[in-house]
């Protein structure tokens, strides 16, 4: 799973996610992408589950880019522990995602295959997302 090699601080504030993504909102690498429509934290496990769903569906053809990285430590206290006594220990890593952010990109696969692969990944993520394509590319069957 993804996590930083080293960080400046062990624990982070919870914070709130305001506004839309200032950067990372356009396709930079692939022809198809998965774009976030809601703000939320996405954990390293969720990113890995989505990555596996995509790679298993495209059967290792094409190229996949993960455009988000879990760089925020999320801490929690153990169950049935009284309030106080400081902040809990870091439990997992998460990425803060704003609406409009591209989460994954795919290239080298047909549009319909990319769409189905991204739909499999959508089920693994806690936010609403949509499939986007470069100008001139189609994610639907030609009829």
Swiss-Prot record:
| Coiled-coil stretches noted in the UniProt entry, renumbered to this chain | none
Q: Report the record's Gene Ontology biological process terms.
A: translation
Record key words, sorted: Ribonucleoprotein, Ribosomal protein, RNA-binding, rRNA-binding, tRNA-binding
Residue ranges, annotated region (Disordered): 1-21
Q: Which cysteines are joined by disulfide bonds?
A: none
GO cellular component, alphabetical, reads: cytosolic large ribosomal subunit
Concerning SUPFAM superfamilies, the annotation shows:
Ribosomal protein L16p/L10e (SSF54686)
Alphabetically, the GO molecular function entries are:
rRNA binding; structural constituent of ribosome; tRNA binding
- Annotated InterPro entries: Ribosomal_uL16, Ribosomal_uL16_bact-type, Ribosomal_uL16_CS, Ribosomal_uL16_dom, Ribosomal_uL16_sf
Q: Where is the composition biased (Basic residues)?
A: 1-17
* HAMAP family, alphabetized: Ribosomal_uL16
The text of the family note is: Belongs to the universal ribosomal protein uL16 family.
Function according to Swiss-Prot or TrEMBL: Binds 23S rRNA and is also seen to make contacts with the A and possibly P site tRNAs.
Quaternary context: Part of the 50S ribosomal subunit.
Q: What is the protein named?
A: Large ribosomal subunit protein uL16
């Amino acid at each position: 799973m993804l996590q930083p090699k080293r960080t400046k601080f062990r624990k982070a504030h919870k914070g709130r996610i305001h506004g839309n993504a200032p950067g990372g909102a356009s396709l930079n690498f692939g022809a198809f992408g998965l774009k976030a429509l809601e703000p939320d934290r996405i954990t390293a496990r969720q990113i890995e589950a989505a990555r596996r769903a995509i790679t298993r569906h495209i059967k290792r053809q094409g190229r996949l880019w993960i455009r988000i990285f879990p760089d925020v430590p999320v801490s929690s206290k153990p169950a049935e522990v009284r309030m106080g006594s400081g902040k809990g220990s870091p439990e997992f890593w998460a990425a803060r995602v704003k609406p409009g952010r591209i989460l994954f990109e795919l290239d080298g696969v047909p549009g319909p295959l990319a769409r189905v692969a991204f739909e499999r990944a959508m089920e693994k993520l806690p936010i609403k997302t949509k499939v986007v394509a470069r100008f001139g590319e189609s994610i639907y069957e030609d009829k």
